[in-house]
Amino acid sequence: MAQSGASKNGKNQGKGGKSSAGGRQSVAAARRSSPGNNRTQLIIGGIAIVVIIAIVVFGVVLNRQQTATQAEGYGASTQSVATASADGVVTVTKPGSTPKATIDVYEDALCPACAELERQFGQQINQQLDNGNLTVNYHMVDFLNRSSHSGDYSSRAAGALLCVAQDSGAQPGVYMALHSALFAPENQPAENGSTDLSNQQLADLAKTAGASDQAQTCISTGANTQAAATAAATFMTNLGTITGGRAGTPTVIYNGAPVTLNSDWLTKLVG
């Protein structure tokens, strides 16, 4: 309708009106089609494209660096052992070592971001444990029980790790092997998924990790599920205090403060 109105006004103005409108259009057209102006726009456009490409490439490279698997190829820990305290904290370290850093790790077995932490830094943690540079205190929480199919998967998985720490923790590498297995893509259930792992399946993972028959029985019977749930409640309260009420997983604590999990956080801690 606006175009129709403009056309009628052009007719009423007569030739002068048309000429005036035509003049304005011609100037605008001339500005767009001027050879010199075109070259300038092409140069500016070309520069802009190059800059955009450079930014994209830089972003891709930076993202790869930030999400790359650290110490890729190192594999499992072979020298670390685990001990469970009365309050459910599992401490993993190399016997006889003098670690450069001790960290506290808060995780939920159903947490996708925790699986990403394991993917990116799990092998580096194993390496630093075996080198005697690191001690890790694991605090397994269960606030994602509500998102598991069974309603208590996080507690049961935490209980499984507690069983292994208590009954097979002295066997080098076993605890860390089960820990890694729980976060592996082929094993970790999906949040709000249609299934999760049974106690027997958790026990089978522990068996593959090298856990003793006693540890496997502890897991398959769910012997430590309630103990793990009780510990998890305390862990979440403590984490909330440390983080100012922003408790979440994964969280890594060093010297009483949360660590920013950039690509070199662990390298900086162990020097």
Tell me the role of every PLM-derived stretch:
Residues 84-101, 242:
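A short beta-strand-turn-helix
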Residues 198-200:
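Mid-domain, small-residue-enriched loop/turn segments at the edges of structured enzyme/sensor domains
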Residues 97-118, 136, 140:
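Short active-site neighborhood of thiol/selenol oxidoreductases, capturing the structured segment around
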Residues 43-46, 61-63, 112-115, 119-123:
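N-terminal carbohydrate-binding/catalytic regions of secreted carbohydrate-active enzymes
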Residues 61-87:
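N-terminal hydrophobic targeting segments that direct proteins to the cell envelope
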Residues 115-196:
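Structural alpha/beta surface segment adjacent to cysteine/selenocysteine redox centers
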Residues 98, 130-131, 170, 244-246:
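Extracellular/periplasmic catalytic domains that process cell-envelope and extracellular macromolecules
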